[in-house]
From Swiss-Prot:
This is Uncharacterized signaling protein CC_0091. Residues 402-536 form the GGDEF domain. NCBIfam families: GGDEF (TIGR00254), sensory_box (TIGR00229). It is a multi-pass membrane protein. The keyword Zinc-finger does not apply. PROSITE patterns: EAL, GGDEF, MHYT. Keywords: Cell membrane, Membrane, Transmembrane, Transmembrane helix. Its main location: membrane. Residues 254-317 form the PAS domain. One of its GO terms (cellular component) is plasma membrane. Residues 545-795 form the EAL domain. Residues 19-206 form the MHYT domain. It comes from Caulobacter vibrioides (strain ATCC 19089 / CIP 103742 / CB 15) (Caulobacter crescentus).
Length: 809
């Protein structure tokens, strides 16, 4: 009979003839429960770090050791040799300590690194521990006989124990699942049971009457009670710890999942390139429930990158996410990181990826880019984009041989619409202009807005110039001439155009735009509603006016302007009763510049309102300082008259300067009224309510004068000097002056004669009951310092009529 056969025979004989099979089953059940609990604890120990790991390891070793120990001694109680037996307390307890120590050491080695070598080494330690515990326990066994050991069978038992423990660790692996825990526990239990009963079959008891069993030894019943109690408490404690930890982990996991699902970003956990878990946001992005995603490959199928290693840690990159249920690819930003909570290693090999949907960001970036390149109101290219596009267009035509024209456009009636109807009306004109320009040009030509009411069209065409540009310019003039409906009325439109051609008028974007602007300036001088091509002779003239406009703007800011005052005298006695404020400009290098030179420049360049406001403030401040309460007359430009803020400005100036409202006289022309008749009358009524006097200037040169006098109670009428200077020279002029003076008497409106230059004119006007006189015959315009003879209290203020025939300013 071979050794194997002999061992099997002795094992079966030992079990069937020397053991109580019921207790054998109990021992096996205790062993199985203990081993299963051991692997439950082992899985927790592998998933922990630091002090927590050490605590789980200690508990694992204690439960495993007590399970082996309990199995051994319950099986020993089942052993019935037919002799009196007992157990040494010291040896019994020492065997428990040996079992716990070896078990803890074996599991520590197995979990130190995830490898077959570690599992094998740990299994050997555990198997040897089971053998050491068994034979230490056998040393605590006392009976009335001599124990004879069969060493080959003893060796076989140790091999079975080591083999069972090693197989258990190899099969269980990390023991993450219940199934693996059950397999590992069952295999370890089998190894323990096989070692025990094989070892028991290795002994033969030779009865010896001389040997006695001391009464102080543990009996079988006492041992069963002690072992059962201790082992039950340890195993139940281990199971309780596992249950508590599992519940805690589930609660924490649920909290984490809720937080993850509340996150705006998609979160996905990947292991070996496959989806392990994901939050609700990621599922929504992919368009599939979590159950369909788990186990699917993430990279390549759902998420693609340009990088070769998409799961590299702590790298932020952009990629494309492909929804599972159709739809367009979604641009995403992905940040990946290895999972590590600082205490657990269950996440070993797992990578968490935060996936952010970039569609809104891309849309916002595109909008920002669009706004940076386009005008916010009209949607046309803005000035910066125009420069780049025009430079690119020049490169294109240089290579292709096409022709290029730059057309500068200015709206003729924009300012009037803006002033009369408000900014909404102005915006409506700009938007409609942009729409018409876009409909008039086709790619590769394009339109842009420079700012205000200035637009640019860049024409790229294949025809001959200037014919092609002239055709487009004429078409634009016609298109922009049609009125624009707004708020139940039609706003007047119209435009002036300046055209420059490449390369004749410039080879750079800056030169072409500057020359087109000069041509536009000439078009506006020609009466508007026309287009003009750039010509070299325009350059010097227009540049001079541009320089003058620039200097005037700076001059207003630097207080280079001064106000001269021309006296007005009562016709009856010649006493000065007031002054008219007349602006003068003393240029730092050019000297005095006549008003006829810089006033038109101010009107053309939008400076007239600022100029008028400055004169109003300066004149009121000067007049407030005079000792005599003489009146001060200030001219209002049409733009000022139609500005809704004019009454507020006048009120503020009067308060600031301290000038009495009755001393301020505002002069307007008839032509200024009719640009927006109703708004002008509203402003005049508000000014009258302040106590300010209103005079109609240049009476007789406009139209509908009588209806104007009927509509508003003017305080004064000023006869234009073109009639006064022809008194006694032309009968019609004399008759007109006499008629106006008669009209003033009938309406009880004082009349002032402008441009009085001779004594003969003074005598005629005095004879016709003219109220006041103004002109060189009365006094020249002079700075405020030269007025003291009239403005100082106590001075009679009368002037002697002059016969010099000079033109008044």
């Amino acid at each position: 009979m071979t050794l194997k056969e002999r061992c099997v025979f002795k094992l079966l004989t030992c079990l069937t003839t020397q053991h109580d099979l019921r207790l054998v089953l109990v021992a096996s059940a205790v062993c199985l429960a203990g081993c299963f609990t051991t692997f439950r604890l082992y899985s927790r120990m592998r998933g922990a770090r630091g002090v927590v790991r050490a605590a789980w390891l200690l508990l694992t070793g204690l439960v495993a050791g007590s399970s082996v120990w309990a199995t051994h001694f319950i099986a020993m109680v089942a052993f019935t040799p037919g002799l009196k037996t007992g157990y040494s307390p010291t040896g019994t307890l020492l065997s428990l300590m040996i079992a716990a120590l070896f078990m803890a050491s074996g599991f520590a080695v197995a979990s130190a690194q995830r490898s077959t070598t570690n599992d094998f080494a740990g299994g050997v330690l555990i198997g040897l521990g089971v053998a050491a515990m068994h034979y230490m326990g056998m040393s605590a066994f006392v009976t009335q006989g001599q124990l004879v050991w069969e060493h080959a069978t003893v060796g076989m038992s140790a091999v079975l124990g080591v083999g069972g423990a090693t197989a258990a660790l190899l099969l269980a692996g990390t023991a993450r699942t219940i199934r693996r825990q059950a397999v590992g526990g069952g295999m370890l239990c089998l190894g323990i049971v096989m070692l025990h009963f094989t070892g028991m079959s290795a002994i033969t008891i030779v009865p010896d009457a001389s040997l006695t069993v001391p009464d102080q030894l543990l009996s079988g019943g006492m041992l069963t009670l002690a072992v059962g109690s201790i082992t039950s408490m340890i195993i139940l404690g281990g199971l309780g710890a596992v249950a508590i930890e599992s519940q805690t982990s589930r609660s924490a996991l649920e909290r984490i999942r809720r937080l993850a699902n509340a996150a705006y970003e998609g979160l996905v956990v990947v292991q070996s390139g496959r989806i392990n878990d994901a939050n609700a946001a990621f599922c929504d992005l992919v368009g599939a429930p979590l159950a369909e995603l788990v186990g699917r490959p993430l990279f390549g199928e759902i998420l693609t990158f340009d990088e070769a290693d998409p799961s590299r840690e702590d790298v932020r990159r952009e990629g494309r996410l492909r929804p599972l249920v159709g739809g367009r690819e979604i641009p995403v930003e992905v940040f990946s990181r290895l999972m590590d909570d600082g205490a657990r290693v269950e996440t070993s090999g797992l990578t968490v990826l935060a996936v952010r949907d970039l569609r809104e960001r891309r849309a916002a970036e595109e909008k920002i880019r669009y706004l940076a390149e386009h005008d916010g109101l009209t949607g046309l290219l803005n000035r910066n984009s125009l420069q780049m596009r025009l430079a690119a267009a020049i490169d294109r035509v240089e290579a292709s041989g096409e022709s290029l024209a730059v057309i500068c456009i200015d709206l003729d009636h924009f300012k009037e619409a803006n002033d009369q109807h408000g900014h909404l009306a102005g915006d409506a004109l700009l938007v409609e202009t942009a729409r018409r320009l876009q409909s008039a040009v086709q790619a590769p030509s394009f339109a842009a807005r420079l700012g205000g009411d200035e637009f640019i069209v860049v024409q790229i065409a294949g025809g001959d110039q200037p014919a092609v540009a002239a055709e487009l310019a004429g078409r634009l003039i016609e298109m922009l001439a049609a009125p624009v409906p707004f708020d139940g009325q039609e706003l007047a439109m119209g435009s002036s155009l300046g055209v420059s051609l490449y390369p004749d008028d410039g080879r750079t974007a800056e030169a072409l735009m500057a020359n087109a602007d000069m041509a536009l300036y000439r078009a506006k001088e020609s009466g508007r509603g026309v287009y003009r091509f750039f010509k070299r002779e325009m350059d010097d003239t227009i540049r001079e006016r541009r320089n003058l406009a620039r200097d005037l703007r700076q001059g207003i800011a630097d207080n280079e302007l001064i106000v001269h005052y021309q006296p007005l005298a009562r016709a009856a006695d010649g006493e000065v009763c007031g002054f008219e404020a007349l602006v003068r400009w003393k240029h730092p290098t050019r000297g005095m510049i006549p008003p006829l030179d810089f006033i038109p420049v101010a009107e053309e360049n939008g400076l007239i309102e600022a100029l008028g406001d400055w004169v109003l403030r300066r004149a009121c401040a000067d007049a407030a300082a005079w000792e005599k309460p003489l009146r001060i007359a200030v001219n209002l430009s049409p733009i000022q008259l139609h500005n809704p803020a004019l009454p507020t400005l006048v009120h503020e100036v009067l308060i600031t300067t301290g000038l009495s409202p009755s001393r301020l006289e505002l002069e307007i022309t008839e032509s200024a009224l009719f640009k927006d008749y109703q708004r002008a009358l509203d402003n005049l009524r508000r000014l009258k309510a302040l106590g300010v006097r209103i005079a109609m200037d240049d009476f007789g040169t406009g139209f509908s004068s009588l209806s104007t006098l009927q509509s508003f109670p003017f305080d004064k009428i000023k006869i234009d000097k073109s009639f006064v200077e022809n008194i006694h020279r032309h009968d019609r002029a004399t008759a007109i002056v006499r008629a106006v003076l008669g009209l003033g008497r009938s309406l009880e409106i004082p009349v002032v004669a402008e441009g009085v230059e001779t004594e003969e004119q003074i005598l005629f006007l005095r004879g016709e009951d003219c109220a006041e006189l103004q002109g060189y015959a009365i006094g020249r315009p002079a700075p405020v310092d030269a007025l003291t003879m009239w403005t100082t209290a106590g001075d009679p203020g009368a002037i002697a009529p002059k016969s010099k025939t000079r033109r008044s300013a």
